[in-house]
UniProtKB/Swiss-Prot annotation:
Localisation per UniProt entry: Nucleus
Binding site for Zn(2+) 2: 1345, 1350, 1368, 1371
Transmembrane segments: none
Keywords: DNA replication, DNA-binding, DNA-directed DNA polymerase, Metal-binding, Nucleotidyltransferase, Nucleus, Transferase, Zinc, Zinc-finger
Pfam hit, one: DNA_pol_B_exo1
Primary location class: nucleus
Annotated protein name in UniProt: DNA polymerase alpha catalytic subunit
PROSITE patterns: DNA_POLYMERASE_B
Residue spans of biased composition, Basic and acidic residues class: 15-25
EC main group: transferase
Region described as Disordered: 1-25, 89-119
InterPro entries per UniProt: DNA-dir_DNA_pol_B, DNA-dir_DNA_pol_B_CS, DNA-dir_DNA_pol_B_exonuc, DNA-dir_DNA_pol_B_multi_dom, DNA/RNA_pol_sf, DNA_pol_a_cat_su_N, DNA_pol_B_thumb, DNA_pol_palm_dom_sf
Amino acid sequence: MSDSGSFAASRSRREKTEKSGRKEALERLKRAKAGEKVKYEVEQVSSIYEEVDEAEYSKLVRDRQDDDWIVDDDGTGYVEDGREIFDDDLEDNALADSGKGAKGAPKDKTNVKKSSVSKPNNIKSMFMASAVKKTTDKAVDLSKDDLLGDLLQDLKSQAVPITPPPVITLKKKKLAGSPLNPFSVPPTAPKVLPTSVKRLPAVTKPGHPAAQSKASVPRQIKKEPKAELISSAVGPLKVEAQVKEEDSGMVEFDDGDFDEPMEEDVEITPVDSSTIKTQAQSIKCVKEENIKEEKSSFITSATLNESCWDQIDEAEPMTTEIQVDSSHLPLVTGADGSQVFRFYWLDAYEDQYSQPGVVYLFGKVWIESADAYVSCCVSVKNIERTVYLLPRENRVQLSTGKDTGAPVSMMHVYQEFNEAVAEKYKIMKFKSKKVDKDYAFEIPDVPASSEYLEVRYSADSPQLPQDLKGETFSHVFGTNTSSLELFLLSRKIKGPSWLEIKSPQLSSQPMSWCKVEAVVTRPDQVSVVKDLAPPPVVVLSLSMKTVQNAKTHQNEIVAIAALVHHTFPLDKAPPQPPFQTHFCVLSKLNDCIFPYDYNEAVKQKNANIEIALTERTLLGFFLAKIHKIDPDVIVGHDIYGFDLEVLLQRINSCKVPFWSKIGRLRRSVMPKLGGRSGFAERNAACGRIICDIEISAKELIRCKSYHLSELVHQILKAERVVIPPENIRNAYNDSVHLLYMLENTWIDAKFILQIMCELNVLPLALQITNIAGNVMSRTLMGGRSERNEYLLLHAFTENNFIVPDKPVFKKMQQTTVEDNDDMGTDQNKNKSRKKAAYAGGLVLEPKVGFYDKFILLLDFNSLYPSIIQEYNICFTTVHREAPSTQKGEDQDEIPELPHSDLEMGILPREIRKLVERRRHVKQLMKQPDLNPDLYLQYDIRQKALKLTANSMYGCLGFSYSRFYAKPLAALVTHQGREILLHTKEMVQKMNLEVIYGDTDSIMINTNCNNLEEVFKLGNRVKSEINKSYKLLEIDIDGIFKSLLLLKKKKYAALTVEPTGDGKYVTKQELKGLDIVRRDWCELAKQAGNYVISQILSDQPRDSIVENIQKKLTEIGENVTNGTVPITQYEINKALTKDPQDYPDKKSLPHVHVALWINSQGGRKVKAGDTISYVICQDGSNLSASQRAYAQEQLQKQENLSIDTQYYLSQQVHPVVARICEPIDGIDSALIAMWLGLDPSQFRAHRHYQQDEENDALLGGPSQLTDEEKYRDCERFKFFCPKCGTENIYDNVFDGSGLQIEPGLKRCSKPECDASPLDYVIQVHNKLLLDIRRYIKKYYSGWLVCEEKTCQNRTRRLPLSFSRNGPICQACSKATLRSEYPEKALYTQLCFYRFIFDWDYALEKVVSEQERGHLKKKLFQESENQYKKLKSTVDQVLSRSGYSEVNLSKLFQTLNTIK
């Protein structure tokens, strides 16, 4: 190192000059131990700072920067940035690691020497420099250095202090940016801020002496337009050389805090005019490129005619800087004339463990001087724990539980709490008072109304146990109530709203990343302001591309695209376009390089792209943008399941500082990631509302899957191009593909934002949250039970009730998704599924068949909420007894209905409020000339009210709900069943036929073809039923022109929609059929849809059968020929839990494929995701369920091919067969034949045993012809002993007319002259062997599952039975039936008797002419041989008990016992 101006010499050091200091200290310690009093002596400390003026200090800093203080390093290794040693940001631990690289990156300050573009300043470049031969210095043309030019631009910028305070920047319309930097401000006339706007003092961090010492220096604002237009740029303009560098220039974001402005306080010195001229030309060039960008295209994608980049700047705002004075808060005058802090809260956060009793509120505050809203954070402190102690009547000994008989007063309760409880749980200070409270919930021995001891103590003290009891008190309520809940309920805050804070205080230390911060010392200083419109919010739509690292198997982020709208309204229609600005950032993989022509390609396309040469730089840049844009809402797809977790993991892995900028609360310790509940990810983003459109879509619409591609297709009617993860790595091979990949990321962000707008997610969530009174970020996570919980919490708290404590479950139920796709998997473990907790809605037995006359569908409006109102069912009105231990658990205890004279309970009152509010809003929507924005606002509000009201009943029956009340839920459903039965009886009394009913609706067969008459009939029925109720109301829900009713909850119909003038149009409606379920392939669904459309059409029956035959034959041929697209074979099935949690992974195809997807990297599939797979032939003998593959596997592996046999027999055939079941002339075997399958495998017993017995009692079989009766029987076969030809016999006689003769008379081969009757003994033996074979087949006892897709076959009788028979252990969906039932055996034996019954055939089968001919021919010998064969069958049938009815046994119950 050089001696002059060395590092040590240039810095002040705090040094102890006195050498005897240690000795003196020991002497003082010795005297103190001896008892001598020691006085504290204040030493006069000399100043450790050298005081200089601003100009001198700036010159000193520049001298340090210019000094090459490392000897012989040629300026390549280290750089002096001129700062003091205490300017380093010591707050974040990550800096310790980043400092090891000895890079010259700026440390959270703006007085930074910009590093040279020509040589990167990092260790890698130093080693590279040492490895090559040293060359002589070349002359450098400074006029071509745009970074130097940028510094020269700063010469005219405004003067700033050394440690400038943060700048709040709100952007307005800007033109297209420079080729590489979308954040540079183009040369436009600046907006000069008024001089009255004050500058905030610097927000300093603890242990930051330099910042603290200069915090009071205000920023000076000069009206210099030319300086403003240059200095307001976020980063310098970049040139082509930057792409080739590793960590230099603007991509060096190692440790910097990007919210700081990047101006320097420099001394103005003369500048060479040529440099200024060059800079002016550069600006002019940028301006021309901005104009060109509007016309140029980026890259033509598969889905867009022109590149999306051409339209991205249509609504971009101008950039203006807003400066907020943090020396005082932006106060306004309240209603009482006092000065209050008014802000709109959007999100709330609490940390019950590290900061108990503190709630952080995040929102927006209006800055009058800047005419804009900025973010704010309010810390509400000192929220006390509040518990209620219920006194006993008499004192009880806790050890024995005996009643001592001594009465208990409130003073006794206080004394026990003070002496026993407070001391045990270290509650040093508490307040208490006597209060009167009501209770109406499920703890049996709590009185309806009583005096309680209310105790309040600091949240810093421990939480009391929930089951705490004492000698003087029996229960303690409110022990585990969170501070946030206490705050929201006590201050009556219902969702995002305007709040006023009295006596707010400035925050002594920065606690958040918000622009304005305030502290409230008492929660009662917060009050709600009503009837003010919500402010606009900043919305950011996010999309990412990741690649899995082959070594670490971690997802690494390579590209991020984001769209931003700075003034997104929450109470109006979404803006068009839905974004104003955007940014994209692209990184390269560690083992890849950018294409050689990438920089040129970007410049030609004028794309707005930031380049980050490492993932760490990309993440640092992203956090900087998040902080600068400061979004209130971050929108994404599967953002909770993937994006947030990956972002936080990569930020942690790359040791990027200020990770907490992803949210709004400053934190240093990152929460532990990887939990299945996503708890850490949610907390990390606190302060910013996370909107996951996947969760919102699941609540608002029905889709076969909720992948982004499917949502784009269904909602936006567009097609999304998906880039497979392996193609992302390949995209770095050339610029075209790399730019296309980045554009694809941008388009995904646009799709996400458009879907959010299309579904009105934010306004709807806001309305629901305002109704329920919870937190909006929780509403967007889709938890309906929490919404109902908060609505009831507010209602009961306002009515002076003690609310039930949040239940604590020892073993939480595994996260499952409400889906029936995986019914019965691992049933033994989930006992709750075996039997419902109480009886649900009533489903009437359907009258299966096809109806071609008008069917009337009547439906009760909101049945369960209406029942709760009609009968005043509430916690406060229904008397519930304690569950009896003597009664069986299976016995439902239905409580009595409340008396009609009782006052309306809180639950029906709340529902009535919702219903009346919705009715009022719908009336407002009918106003003429209504503003479209207002109409949309009303529509969203009525939807929110409807969603909330309809889900209110659910909290009663949900066992994990805080307001779970099984008796109330059972009473509601019981009344629903009674109402449906009563409705059915009333309709039948009107001489009408009810063909089906389900929970809240009935179907009536009108036997009428006149639509007008049907409506009259419906209105008559409706008025008669509604007379019986005050609030319950039934209405005409629809009219079906034709209906195919298959079974319970499964039907297809043509609904009638009148168009006026007596005309109507029809629309197909499907309920519960296979073709509306997602676990059937598209091929089967299309076949089923076609069959249904044919059946419901007006064509003749023969034409329908013929059309179905043609279609199925065509499908069979197309599948066999391989002309069906692969997408038609995809089967979709949802995961009800995480793939690794399934016990039998191999037997479940979607789980098997899900595990493969997770092993490939990229997005991990989890519970709730829908998996698409195809069944393939892979050369193995495994079952179809184990031959499931993802479509990507099919395309990559040559040995895989579609299993056409499976799709025809297990997908198309079952779907079509079930639909055609009630249709005469079509059966399973016929459908199989049309599809090209073996019909013998599908000769299924279509009718169940119970149906067959009913038919037999009604004489069904006797009405069938012999041909129909024996249609499914196997024919008798006999090989001719002479020629070996197989003869098949199915009747006594062959031929007709004069050619008729016994079937056994001659061999079926014309050339053979042998007669089987000559070998009657052999025929007899063959017949006996066949009979024995069938009897053996019956007694082998094979059982098969009646579900065609299951194909389970077993001889083991399961232990679990249903009403219809033993339940299949394989699928747990259907029952097992005998593969060869007794009726089939009996019918087969009867068939053998039929083909040898000479007398019966002579009398019943042949005509009179043929009968006379047979008698003339004298077949006496043949007749005797036939009778011998028949007698063999008769002997066997005589031993069968199937055809006998034991009358004595049948009527034995009628015998009287003597």
